Amino acid sequence: MDFKAGQHQVQHLPAETLQFLLGSRYCETDVLSEEAWRLFKDTPLGWPRVQAICDFVHNHLAFGYEHARPTRTAAEAYAERRGVCRDFAHLAITFCRCLNIPARYCTGYVSDIGIPPPHAPMDFAAWMEVYLGGRWFTFDPRNNGIPFGRILIAQGRDAADVPLT
């Protein structure tokens, strides 16, 4: 963890990160941009801003497997205030992108070590990676703790890039 990892100016980002600044099927940056700036405009850039986004999403959404809906977008999750891990990830990714922070969707297995219920052992989960300080860092707005014990299966712009069958 590099809690001092800084945010890059857009013109200094590597070309391969730029696609992770754009809106996508489940991450509607055009819908949530004003809200992102309203909520986080005064938050310090870089790691503190991303952590503030994760803290907000973690507290704003109610988690529950009964809330699972495969078509829910970030804007819908924000309005409905509920979802599953993919909704937490989509909302945090969207806020990051609105604030010019490259963020990508990750899916895989998360260890149950040190993570409070409700979750199944070695639960299939979604989280995000954010580009700060010249590298990608893992953030999990659903569990909102130091991420460890993850098995990455796929990465993409959002869940549409890495569908489960």
Task: Label each residue range with its predicted role.
Residues 55, 87-165:
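Hydrophobic/aromatic-rich core segments of domains that either
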